[in-house]
Amino acid sequence: VPAPGETGGSGGGESASVARHRAQAPQQVHCAVLTVSDTRNLQSDLGGDLLVQLLESAGHRVVFREIVADDADAIRAAALCALAGDCRALLLTGGTGIAPRDVTPEALRPLLERELPGFGELFRMLSYREIGAAALLSRALAGQRGGKLLFALPGSRGAIRTALEKLVLPELGHLAGESARRA
């Protein structure tokens, strides 16, 4: 039985506890953006541009941006560099498919202190609604390290928009606040 003012079950309602945590969450989160690609540069990185645009339009601040090669060691090194800075959330785009060069999940998993499996599950569910069975090819993931958030997203602009608009942006302040409390 839910407490007074809370909704029970999965009706999509927001509990009083979640509402309270959201109200206490930071309104602006400092973010880092890494694009994983062997072919992009800052002038041709449309996915990274979209990530920056969506984050900044939602009131967040991008404090670090870089392009890194599709190489697990390079991805790990760039992620650690970004996380050592003034960001609370690191968003990576690219390298989450099943091609041989797609190594972003393998690069990041050893860095995670805690994985957030619901992110990948929900992202694939939303993707299935938009693109059908091709959603199987996504290995998007999220997790925490040192009180900071990591999100590994596909390189497709449609997938970036879906992930940001439907999952990341609605909860980013809440997630950042909770992650910092537990650090």
Which positions does each model-derived feature cover?
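Non-catalytic beta/alpha edge segments that cap or flank active sites
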Residues: 1-183
